[in-house]
Each structure stands twice: as C-alpha cells, then as structure tokens.
C-alpha cells in the first residue's frame, strides 16, 4: 500500500497530478480542495495517499490533510459510492462542511453535489453519522454562534462533560459572549438536561 508520496510536482491538470518521486512519476487524482492548495509546478509536495487496486488499474488518490483522506476512506465504505463519487463529494465541499451536513442531517445540501441524488444523499447521511468526526461540523456551526466556542468547549470537557454534551450546550451561547459568561450559560443549559 502506498500511504504517502513526497516529491516534485511536475504537472497539474484538475483533478490529475504528476509527482516525480526519485525518478518515478506517480499519477495521482486529488479533490479540488487539495488541488487549490498545491504548490506551483516544480516545487516539492507531500501527499497522503489512498491506493486502490482494481483488476485493470492501480489508482492513487492524494490528499493534503489526514481528515480528507479519512473522509475519503469512510465514503468508500458506503454502498454505491466509488472513488470518483467520493472525490466529487470532497471537491464539492470541505470535510467540515460535510461533517456539518451530516450533523444537521441536511440531505438538500448533499444533493447539490454532482452525481448525488436524494437516495444517495440519505444513504450518505445515515452511514456517515458519527463516523467522520461529525462533532467537527457541529463545532464549526457552534463557532459561528460564539467567538469563543472552542475555549468554552475545552472548559466543559475539562469539567467532565463529553464533547457531544458540550457542543449541544454551546448552541445556547449567543455570539460575542465572553468565555467565562459562555461557560456559565453552557453549564446552565447542561443542568436543564
């Protein structure tokens, strides 16, 4: 299994790359989220990879972050989702946006992606629930509500609450609330549960 490639980026043609690694050129497909963050051709690049071996081909898919690769792997486990569709999902939305859609069970958001119909979107939501750090999406939503959501969440976890409980409580904290006041409001919300 090829898990990582480091080399010189020779070609960039969305979504395909050619990376020279000690004289061997690897063709790698990447999601657009990775493509837009690549260095210029001729520069060094490090990609985390997922190798897929088929009867007729050995394919490499590359990612800049471990979260993207993990999400790609989770998508591949879903019936009816192949590598191309998984790549399309990651090209159409970030890992955080996907996690948030899963947390909110927002099928409409997924159906906007090319090749994803209503049934496929519902299957994605069902099978990804709790598997790709859905709390990441919830935290992103909570962060938009409160400037100090991460600090408040860390304090709640330090007090013995789970991240899931903390994220639910943070939703009750208005935007712009300070950390200490936010902790008080979150604790008040948790005491009502």
UniProtKB/Swiss-Prot annotation:
Single biological process term from Gene Ontology: DNA recombination
Any one cellular-component term (Gene Ontology): cytoplasm
Region (Domain II): 65-139
This protein's UniProt keywords: Cytoplasm, DNA damage, DNA recombination, DNA repair, DNA-binding
CDD domains reported in the protein's UniProt record: UBA_RuvA_C
Chain coiled-coil ranges: none
Cysteine disulfide links: none
Subcellular location: Cytoplasm
Its biological purpose: The RuvA-RuvB-RuvC complex processes Holliday junction (HJ) DNA during genetic recombination and DNA repair, while the RuvA-RuvB complex plays an important role in the rescue of blocked DNA replication forks via replication fork reversal (RFR). RuvA specifically binds to HJ cruciform DNA, conferring on it an open structure. The RuvB hexamer acts as an ATP-dependent pump, pulling dsDNA into and through the RuvAB complex. HJ branch migration allows RuvC to scan DNA until it finds its consensus sequence, where it cleaves and resolves the cruciform DNA.
Name listed for the protein in its UniProt record: Holliday junction branch migration complex subunit RuvA
């Amino acid at each position: 299994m090829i898990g990582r490639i480091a080399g010189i980026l020779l070609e960039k043609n969305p979504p395909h790359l050619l990376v020279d690694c000690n004289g061997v050129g690897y063709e790698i497909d990447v999601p657009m989220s990775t493509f837009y963050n690549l260095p210029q051709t001729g520069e060094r690049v490090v990609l985390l990879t997922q190798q897929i071996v088929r009867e007729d081909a050995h394919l490499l898919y590359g990612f800049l972050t471990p979260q993207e690769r993990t999400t790609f792997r989770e998508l591949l486990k879903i019936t009816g989702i192949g590598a191309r569709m998984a790549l399309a999902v990651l090209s159409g939305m970030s890992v955080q946006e996907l996690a948030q859609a899963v947390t909110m069970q927002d099928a409409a958001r997924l159906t906007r992606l090319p090749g994803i119909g209503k049934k496929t979107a519902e299957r994605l939501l069902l099978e990804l629930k709790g598997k790709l750090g859905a709390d990441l999406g919830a935290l992103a939503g909570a962060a938009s509500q409160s400037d100090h959501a991460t600090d408040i969440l860390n304090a709640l976890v330090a007090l013995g609450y789970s991240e899931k409980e903390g994220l639910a409580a943070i939703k009750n904290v208005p935007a712009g609330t300070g950390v200490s006041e936010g902790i008080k409001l979150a604790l008040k919300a948790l005491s009502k549960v």
